[in-house]
Curated annotation (Swiss-Prot):
Region (Disordered): 47-330
Name of this protein: Translation initiation factor IF-2
Region listing for G2, in residue ranges: 475-479
Function: One of the essential components for the initiation of protein synthesis. Protects formylmethionyl-tRNA from spontaneous hydrolysis and promotes its binding to the 30S ribosomal subunits. Also involved in the hydrolysis of GTP during the formation of the 70S ribosomal complex.
SUPFAM superfamilies reported for this sequence: Initiation factor IF2/eIF5b, domain 3 (SSF52156), P-loop containing nucleoside triphosphate hydrolases (SSF52540), Translation proteins (SSF50447)
Organism of origin: Mycobacterium ulcerans (strain Agy99)
One Pfam family, short name: EF-G_D2
Biased composition annotated in UniProt, kind: Basic and acidic residues: 86-95
Region feature G4, mapped onto this chain: 554-557
Compartmental location: Cytoplasm
Biased composition (Pro residues): 105-121, 144-169, 208-223
């Protein structure tokens, strides 16, 4: 504790008991609890003064006596002035004035070098203590040199604590100044040391002695003059260590002399092993406690004023610059070698491959290469790409950024990522387990494809002996239907699974899913219509999936049917009939009349037996594909799945895409419950926690926990991919146009099936109207319109599109109250047409200027009611009231965008005046002259198609 002392230490120092000290403190108005309590330095000083300077005990040993003699030498020197023993009130006043009021004290002239003879006394009211006398050893020891007498006005230094060993003196010894260089002219007022309770003033540094040995060695055990000074006592120059260092020249030493040491320089500034003292004349005050960084460079340039840094342990001064470690040098070298991308230094790769998922962010990329995401963001910004650290980034941007840093960025496809995900759970998809002996024959899966209204569903109705077509809105198929029928082939009952796909152009994804999940494709072509666009698309899907095609030429019973023409047209697309020497089977049928249906079934079975190896392992865990899914109000999420391998049973834990659950019930196409589904069997599965996506692969896992983890990871991947796809890239060049006001139509899509919603969204997003309007689907889902959808639409100004669904509960009432528009559709192309019209209606109108007529100003009249009236003659065309006008003077436009406020013919208000008539009009403009022309026009909105 700097400046503080305990009561028992003071009692021991003064030679009295602790009770006497406590009593004396109580008389002085100081409340002290016990002998172990501490008192402040001013209180200790007044206590010593009240005891008459203290009663010092004689030295009991050589070592201890030497230490005490150093501290109390000014009191024992013979011939000292009596003023040295009495309290110096003038010195206290000078100290209070210097510390409290900040007034500079007068600077004495530099003192000469100290000599063994006593120094002449100076006036006590000078305000600055002269250089401290060199302490002498006690009388019991042989002093090496005669001691100096204390100067007049010098106060005895307090020693609050018991002196320690000679090598580590007590921190309470009297402050002083070390010898230093002679101060230059213009020296500033020395500042008080860091101890605000000290009664001593900083002194001028005496001129250092020449380096020479003192006559007489110091007593053994005494403090070494050349070592660390005792507290703030000024050390003797020279000594056993070979004399003091020569005074430094040049810039002052910043901070503490040694790391962790107190303030001051090593040998030419104030400070010691404990509390730092004044660093000499003009030096910054040392300070701080031991172990803390001190401030104030000792031995600084004379006249330099120290700061408060370093006082009371506060860090001060500049840090010492050390050598760089090898690691720091290597990091600096690597930073210099790093590539600069967009003005930012980034890590330099060695050509290694970085695998990133589609829709990854810059944070994901930075984690892979151990870089700072902020640096990647800044680099892309300087390259003209504005992306945040957590925003999904496109594949091209990631690859470009990686190539600049010498990394080979590979964006993992969704299929590869899903395969890696399943492999992490020791699962595989798409392969039959077991050997060849475990494989059994399965029924063929046949997909019926073709153009809209060519009779696909009627053909399936004829085969199934049902009427599905009448139940479809608009007479067109808008879902994928899966059925399994039994046919008689050569006296043997065979099963065939049929999948019906939509033929409308909006259902491209459905047809693609049907082609991937099938073994054989039946291409239905109307004999009276020929090959149409969706026919060509169906051919492309089947050929891309490497699926054999059987062509069914339908409607041969209608007028104008020409099956030969169909065969010729399909030849252009690689489908050559067997009649023409090809390998594609053609069957002429009539689905309405039921003609040649058995021949078509036989052609399908022959193709399956001849070209395909239709076998699967029924004993493994089931795998397949979800062809369709919807949300049933009473049963919850329902998925139509096609088992491709294995056997699906009630109670199995399944995962399909980002949906999972346990099979609670299975229903076939006739609505009957099924306990198990063998390969190639389509069933409706009830028990999913959410609606699976159409076309998602499903598989059976061991437990629900694994299914949930797989579904959660797929859901996160789906969100990232969707965010990357929907994010509109904005470059700095396009920033101006991006900031312009654009109209956006927000939609919420709800449908009865997942595939229908997907097809509707893709069709709507394909509408191209203009860059000024944009279409955004903010939410999509399967099932009825709920209050949550209405609240979201109200918050985002969206329109709700319901496809084959209605509003549930109080959703309609809430929509009416919130002003949310709900549109219901049952035919997909009606929804597409109306949304396209709505987008066109949101376009900003384009106005075209149509000139009406010109009028010449013949006279001007002023009216106190209406202002300036122009008497005009209509020279051409017609002038209408409230029409736009511009003023022409010498065929130069004077002012634009005027309005004809009033129009009169004689005394009657009129709406228009034709050519050859006079009239009076007001324009709300006063700078009119005779001879000016008024040109009238109107803006007509132009239709934007």
């Amino acid at each position: 504790m700097a400046g503080k002392a305990r009561v028992h230490e003071l009692a021991k120092e003064l030679g009295v008991t602790s009770k006497e000290v406590l009593a004396r403190l109580s008389e002085q108005g100081e409340f002290v609890k016990s002998a172990s309590s501490t008192v402040e330095a001013p209180v200790a000083r007044r206590l010593r003064e009240s005891f008459g300077g203290g009663k010092s005990a004689p030295a009991k040993g050589s070592d201890t006596g030497a230490a005490k003699g150093v501290a109390k030498a000014p009191q024992k020197v013979s011939g000292a002035s009596p003023a040295a023993k009495a309290p110096d009130r003038s010195l206290d006043a000078a100290l209070d004035k210097a510390v409290g009021n900040g007034a500079p004290a007068p600077v004495p002239a530099p003192a000469p070098a100290p000599t063994p003879a006593p120094a002449p006394a100076q006036p006590a009211d000078s305000g600055v203590a002269p250089p401290a006398a060199t302490p002498a050893a006690p009388a019991a020891s042989a002093a090496p040199a005669p001691p100096k007498a204390p100067l007049p006005g010098q106060r005895p230094a307090p020693t609050p604590g018991k002196p320690a060993a000679p090598q580590a003196p007590h921190p309470g010894m009297a402050p002083g100044a070390r010898p230093g260089p002679v101060p230059k002219q213009g020296v500033r007022t020395p500042r008080v040391g860091n101890n605000p309770f000290s009664s001593a003033q900083p002194v001028d540094r005496p001129i250092p002695r020449p380096q020479a040995p003192r006559p007489g060695a110091p007593r053994p055990g005494a403090p070494r003059p050349g070592g660390a000074s005792s507290g703030n006592m000024p050390p003797r120059p020279g000594g056993a260590s070979g004399g003091p260092r020569p005074p430094r020249t040049g810039a002052p030493r910043p901070g503490g002399g040694r790391p962790g040491g107190p303030g001051g320089g090593r040998s030419d500034g104030g400070g010691g092993n404990y509390r730092g003292g004044g660093g000499g004349v003009g030096a910054a005050p040392g300070g701080g406690f031991r172990g803390r960084p001190g401030g104030g460079g000792g031995g600084g340039r004379p006249g330099q004023r120290g700061g408060a840094a370093g006082a009371f342990g506060r860090p001060g001064g500049a840090p010492r610059r050390g050598r760089k470690s090898k690691r720091a040098k290597r990091a600096e070298y690597e930073n210099m070698q790093a590539p600069v991308v967009g003005g930012v230094r980034l890590p330099h790769g060695n050509g290694e491959t970085i695998r990133l998922a589609r829709g990854a962010s810059l944070s994901d990329f930075a984690d892979k290469i151990n870089a700072n995401p902020a640096a990647l963001v800044q680099a892309l910004f300087n390259l003209g790409e504005m992306v945040t650290a957590t925003q999904s980034v496109g594949d091209e941007t990631l690859e470009l950024l990686g190539s600049e840093m010498n990394y080979n960025v590979q964006v993992v496809s969704p299929e590869d990522e899903d395969r890696e995900l399943l492999e992490s759970f020791d699962l595989t998809y798409g392969e039959d387990s077991g050997d060849e002996s475990e494989l059994q024959t399965r029924p063929p899966v046949v997909t019926v494809m073709g153009h809209v209204d060519h009779g696909k569903t009627r053909l399936l109705d004829t085969i199934r002996k049902a009427n599905v077509r009448e139940g479809e809105a608009g007479g067109i198929t808008q879902h994928i239907g899966a059925y399994q029928v039994s046919v008689d082939h050569d006296g043997t009952e065979r099963l065939i699974t049929f999948i019906d796909t939509p033929g409308h152009e909006a259902f491209t994804a459905m047809r693609a899913r049907g082609a991937k999940a099938t073994d054989i494709a039946i291409l239905v072509v109307a004999a009276d219509d020929g090959v149409m666009p969706q026919t060509v698309e169906a051919i492309n899907h089947a050929q891309a999936a490497d699926v054999p095609i059987v062509v069914a030429v339908n409607k041969i019973d209608k007028e104008g049917a020409d099956p030969a023409k169909i065969r010729g047209q399909l030849t252009e697309y690689g489908l050559v009939a067997e009649d023409f020497g090809g390998d594609t089977m053609f069957v002429d049928i009539s689905a309405k009349q039921g003609t040649n249906i058995e021949a078509l079934e036989e052609a399908v079975l022959l193709t399956a037996d001849a070209a395909l190896d239709l076998r699967a392992n029924p004993d493994m865990e089931a795998q397949g594909v979800a062809i369709e899914a919807h949300l049933d109000r009473g049963r919850g999420p329902v998925a139509t799945v096609l088992v491709q391998r294995g056997t699906l049973r009630v109670g199995d834990s399944v995962v399909a895409g980002d949906a999972y659950g346990r099979v609670r019930r299975m229903v076939d196409e006739h609505g009957e419950d099924v306990e198990e589904a063998l390969p190639s069997r389509p069933v409706q599965v009830i028990g999913f926690t959410s609606v699976p996506g159409a076309g998602d692969n499903f598989l059976v896992v061991d437990e629900d926990r694994i299914a949930r983890q797989i579904a959660d990871r797929r859901s996160a991947r789906k969100r990232n991919a969707l965010a990357a796809r929907s994010r509109k890239r904005i470059s700095l060049e396009d920033l101006d146009s991006a900031l312009k006001e654009t109209s956006q139509l927000n939609l919420i899509l709800k449908g009865d099936n997942a595939g229908t919603v997907e097809a509707l969204e893709e069709a709507l997003m394909g509408i191209e109207v203009d860059d000024e309007v944009a279409l955004r689907v903010i939410d999509r889902g399967v099932g009825g319109i709920t209050e949550t959808n209405v609240n979201l639409a109200s918050a985002s100004d969206a329109i709700i599109i319901g496809f084959n669904v209605r509003a549930e509960g109080k959703a309609t009432e809430l929509a009416n109250r919130e002003g949310v528009e709900i549109r219901y559709y049952s035919v997909i192309y009606q929804a597409i047409d109306e949304i396209e019209k709505a987008l066109r209606g949101m376009l900003k109108p384009i106005y075209e200027e149509v000139e009406l007529g010109r009028a010449e100003i013949r006279a001007l009249f002023r009216s106190s009611k209406v202002g300036l009236i122009a008497g005009c003659m209509i020279s051409s065309g017609v002038v209408r009231r409230n029409a736009k006008a511009r003023l022409l003077r010498d065929n130069i436009v004077v002012v634009e965008n005027l309005s004809i406020r009033s129009l009169r013919r004689e005394k009657d208000d009129v709406t228009e005046v034709r050519e050859g008539f006079e009239c009076g009009m007001t324009l709300g403009y006063s700078d009119l002259k005779e001879g000016d022309f008024i040109e009238s026009y109107e803006l007509v909105q132009k239709d934007r198609s």
